[in-house]
Amino acid sequence: MPTINQLVRQGAXAETIKSKSAAMENSPQRRGVCTRVYTTTPKKPNSALRKVAKVPLTNGFEVISYIGGEGHNLQEHSVVLVRGGRVKDLPGVRYHIVRGSLDLQGVKDRKQSRSKYGAKRPKK
């Protein structure tokens, strides 16, 4: 703990802000190839089988990212686009995979919030 005199002479060191998605390295998205696609269970009090994938990114980081929406066509060696954004009830999952981009298709028969799930506009 510095004294008031020390603070007057030197000033306080500025606190560095730690990124919530370090692996992105200030990029909006990163590309990667799935090495493992699996399901995991959320922490209490929720219960489900959440779909996640382990993805080594082009910058060398290996991240666990969430596959949103109902159903997906991902498997090992699928090329995906990863964005930041954590899943609150899955510890260690701090990234999302972008639907409708590269090898991951959009959600089928999606009518609302289509842009978030890469779904095309339905025909009349």
Swiss-Prot record:
Q: Which UniProt keywords apply?
A: Methylation, Ribonucleoprotein, Ribosomal protein, RNA-binding, rRNA-binding, tRNA-binding
Q: Name one GO biological process term.
A: translation
One Gene Ontology CC term in the entry: small ribosomal subunit
Known InterPro entries for this protein?
NA-bd_OB-fold, Ribosomal_uS12, Ribosomal_uS12_bac
- Residues modified to 3-methylthioaspartic acid: 89
Q: Which domain of life is it from?
A: Bacteria
Q: Where is the composition biased (Basic residues)?
A: 113-124
Function recorded in the entry:
With S4 and S5 plays an important role in translational accuracy. Interacts with and stabilizes bases of the 16S rRNA that are involved in tRNA selection in the A site and with the mRNA backbone. Located at the interface of the 30S and 50S subunits, it traverses the body of the 30S subunit contacting proteins on the other side and probably holding the rRNA structure together. The combined cluster of proteins S8, S12 and S17 appears to hold together the shoulder and platform of the 30S subunit.
> In which family does this protein belong, per the annotation?
Belongs to the universal ribosomal protein uS12 family.
Q: How does it assemble?
A: Part of the 30S ribosomal subunit. Contacts proteins S8 and S17. May interact with IF1 in the 30S initiation complex.
By what name is this protein known? Small ribosomal subunit protein uS12
- Organism annotation: Thiomonas delicata (Thiomonas cuprina)
Taxonomic placement: Bacteria, Pseudomonadati, Pseudomonadota, Betaproteobacteria, Burkholderiales
